[in-house]
């Protein structure tokens, strides 16, 4: 089952059968971002919340240890993290954990070998998903795809710049339409999307549409 699921997911991404449906800040969503979650999925725990409005005061509904729970929000600076085209040959090493660890306008960005402080990418449109600014938090976008969906020019849809991790949802070969959430923070041991190239375009409705070709590597493990 794991091999079939992974092959089908890879085929969908390769032939362009995914269509991003990206949205801005949802009703009831609080400002700020979610703290990094680098821990493994040790237990299968039900979600304690679904959205920010279910959390008290300034807490946000974020994934921690692979299930959603109310946690203190973190301050997130404006601008998107630059793309990292490098391949890491050394062990993962985090030099920062959140934007406030970085000086000035620098952001704590996830690079090939871990998080470090970097200047935000130039020319990014404010409010576009993937930037994880104070209005969008760390959830970058919502996407869905089906076997007949294509962007207008027939090429695959692409994710905003950066490394995006699919939340804990297992893709089944029988699924004709599978919605998924992605995060800029690693959520192990689920799907990991790498090598995404994108040019974000803002529509009149404030959405970000990314009809560009991307190359993607996938790693997955089945939930226990």
From Swiss-Prot:
GO MF term (any one): serine-type endopeptidase inhibitor activity
Start and end residues of each WAP domain: 27-73, 74-121
Keywords: Disulfide bond, Protease inhibitor, Repeat, Secreted, Serine protease inhibitor, Signal
InterPro entries: Elafin-like_sf (IPR036645), WAP_dom (IPR008197), WAP_four-disulfide_core (IPR050514)
Annotated disulfide bonds: 34-62, 41-66, 49-61, 55-70, 81-109, 88-113, 96-108, 102-117
Any GO CC annotation of this UniProt entry: extracellular space
UniProt cross-references to CDD domains, sorted A to Z: WAP
Domain of life: Eukaryota
Cellular localization per UniProt: Secreted
Pfam families membership: WAP (PF00095)
GO BP term, example: antibacterial humoral response
SMART domains on file: WAP
Span of the signal peptide: 1-24
Entry's induction text: By p53/TP53.
Biological role stated in the UniProt entry: Putative acid-stable proteinase inhibitor.
Protein's UniProt name: WAP four-disulfide core domain protein 5
Organism of provenance: Homo sapiens
Lineage: Eukaryota, Metazoa, Chordata, Craniata, Vertebrata
